């Protein structure tokens, strides 16, 4: 193993593919600590909708970057990058392996490569113009502009993530480069000795699992969880733009029946899974492992362990 570069395991994959359970099994065997690579699990009191791991499921494996922010607080990829790099150093010093687990591709990528999140390639005047467009015509209008000019970024960035949509347009306007080209220009080499594992699944099977997971979330009390945030007056915040929250907000505000909101949630979750896979395949050099049932989880764990051991020279 390259001793100058700390070892890091990264386990990625779309929502509902089975990352959580497998990550704990691997962490137990590898003496690893898990860092959440999900941009929404950072928020307190947002447990069901973000599919946050329960304490009893952790099996004593330390988990980081969960429940660190109030739902009213914003959180950026630059902040994530800084905190996670500190965590990796801390875990490495303890003689344990850091394992990043999640589905927010840009967040994970920002940690692994030496991306700079300064105001380089910034144009405050253009940004203000786009913000005015968004306020006047809606987030979808600005996202459609991005879709015309940088389809890949548009697929990776949710329309309601206004700040990131505008930033992608700003980079294009200032540099003439797409978001990916701009980041590729910064992407010299990995900062860590990295074993990058991806879990995938046949699309129809994955979509069925997503639909079932949404039904399970509703049974577990997702509507009550969202209503608590709504009653706390958590509005127009980054946190409740998350899938699972904005759809049920539409119901609570009388813009959709509960049945319509749940169907929209399922559809948005399926689309998000598709965007996640597109991002990972286009942006990252991943060793993919198929989790389509029937799958022998112990055998799959062994295959992944063997890959990690070879990659990190364990």
From Swiss-Prot:
EC supergroup of this enzyme: transferase
A biological process term (GO) from this entry: tRNA modification
Keyword Magnesium: yes
Binding residue positions for substrate: 15-20
Obligatory cofactor(s): Mg(2+)
Site (Interaction with substrate tRNA): residue numbering on this chain: 104, 127
Region (Interaction with substrate tRNA): 38-41
Disulfide bond annotation, renumbered to this chain: none
EC number(s) from the headed UniProt entry: 2.5.1.75
Matching SUPFAM superfamilies: P-loop containing nucleoside triphosphate hydrolases
Reaction(s) the record says it catalyses: adenosine(37) in tRNA + dimethylallyl diphosphate = N(6)-dimethylallyladenosine(37) in tRNA + diphosphate
Alphabetized GO MF terms: ATP binding; tRNA dimethylallyltransferase activity
Keywords: ATP-binding, Magnesium, Nucleotide-binding, Transferase, tRNA processing
Residues engaged in binding ATP: 13-20
NCBIfam families according to UniProt: miaA
PANTHER family: TRNA DIMETHYLALLYLTRANSFERASE (PTHR11088:SF60)
Quaternary structure, from the entry: Monomer.
The protein's name: tRNA dimethylallyltransferase
Gene label: miaA
